[in-house]
Every structure is written in structure tokens, then in C-alpha cells.
């Protein structure tokens, strides 16, 4: 049976230094985000960045945080709901960093009897720090916990004509700019 795993970047649980610290640590310790040897990345992230960044980032997150929670999580859940309403295929939502995790998303699909997973990174472009890290972690989890599953990943679509038209249309509608 087939299912879809939507994957976005992620967000801390709340806009507080306490919740930002583990989120930033998970994110910045990813070798595909900071491409340094592990020893140097550890010194940089744990020895320098995590001592000050959570407090500074919390102030920025508080400015954009919605009463419903993280805008990224809220909008990702809304996207999942819209897709579910218009599809008969089981959909699960996960985040590369934070929760719901990729493991949780795969577990949800597994519990529904899904064994063919179409992974949809919610980024149009390919980058080591986005799409690649999703694929690497998903494959690691598959090998460790869901070896019966088969994965296919949506290829980058930044140059897809329909995607460009949709983004253009959304922009024009939002700004009420007429097409010329």
C-alpha cells in the first residue's frame, strides 16, 4: 500500500531559549547543515553558538510566533489537511528537526499498513542542508526500524513550469498586481 510523507524543516516547540536550544543543536550539528569535521562543528555549536543563540533566537521567534504555535508547523498541518481532503492516499507530516519527527511520520504510515512511501520534501530546490539530509535520515530510520518499506523521493521542482505558475499566481493574487 502507498502513502506520502511530507517533510518540512521543523521548528522548536515554543519560542523560548529552553526549547530553542535542543532544536538548534539538532539542526546545527547536522553535518549537512554545517559542513565541518565533527570535532570542529561540536566546538562551534556547543561551545559557542548554543551559549548565546537560543536567547537571541527566542526574541526573533516570539515576533513571528502565532497563538496556534509555530507558523511553519501550523501551515504544514494545514497543507497536510488540504491534501488529505483531496486524496485517498494516506498522508503523514514530519519535520527534519523537531517534532513530529521523521520516525514518527513513518511509524504512523506503518501502523496504517503502508509500505511504499513517497517522500515529499517541502522545498522546491535540492540542497544538502534540506533534501539530502531528509533522505539520509529517512533511509537510516528505514534500515533500523522499517526495513520492509520502500522509498521514492520527489525530485527538485524549482524549475517546474506548473510550480512557477502557481507561485507567480499566488504572489500576484496576494499583491493584486495585474498580469501583463
Which residues make up each language-model segment?
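Active-site micro-motifs of SAM-dependent methyltransferase domains
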Residues: 11-13, 124, 179
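Long, hydrophobic, well-ordered secondary-structure blocks that form the structural core
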Residues: 92-165
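A Trp-anchored, charged/polar loop motif used as the substrate-binding/catalytic surface
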Residues: 164-172
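Single conserved hydrophobic/aromatic residue that forms the stacking wall/gate
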Residues: 171, 176-180
Amino acid at each position: 500500500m502507498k502513502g506520502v510523507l511530507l517533510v518540512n524543516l521543523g521548528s522548536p516547540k515554543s519560542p523560548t531559549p529552553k526549547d530553542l536550544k535542543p532544536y538548534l543543536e539538532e539542526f546545527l550539528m547536522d553535518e549537512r547543515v554545517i559542513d565541518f569535521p565533527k570535532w570542529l562543528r561540536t566546538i562551534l555549536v556547543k561551545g559557542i553558538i548554543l551559549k548565546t543563540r537560543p536567547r537571541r533566537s527566542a526574541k526573533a521567534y516570539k515576533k513571528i510566533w502565532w497563538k496556534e504555535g509555530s507558523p511553519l508547523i501550523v501551515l504544514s498541518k494545514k497543507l497536510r489537511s488540504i491534501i488529505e481532503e483531496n486524496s485517498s492516499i494516506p498522508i503523514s507530516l514530519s519535520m527534519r528537526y523537531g517534532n513530529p519527527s521523521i520516525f514518527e511520520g513513518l511509524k504512523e504510515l506503518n501502523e496504517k499498513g503502508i509500505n511504499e512511501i513517497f517522500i515529499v520534501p517541502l522545498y522546491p530546490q535540492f540542497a544538502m542542508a534540506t533534501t539530502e539530509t531528509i533522505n539520509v535520515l529517512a533511509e537510516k530510520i528505514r534500515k533500523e526500524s522499517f526495513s520492509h518499506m520502500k522509498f521514492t523521493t520527489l525530485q527538485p521542482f524549482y524549475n517546474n513550469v506548473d510550480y512557477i505558475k502557481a507561485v507567480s499566481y499566488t504572489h500576484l493574487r496576494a499583491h493584486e498586481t495585474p498580469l501583463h
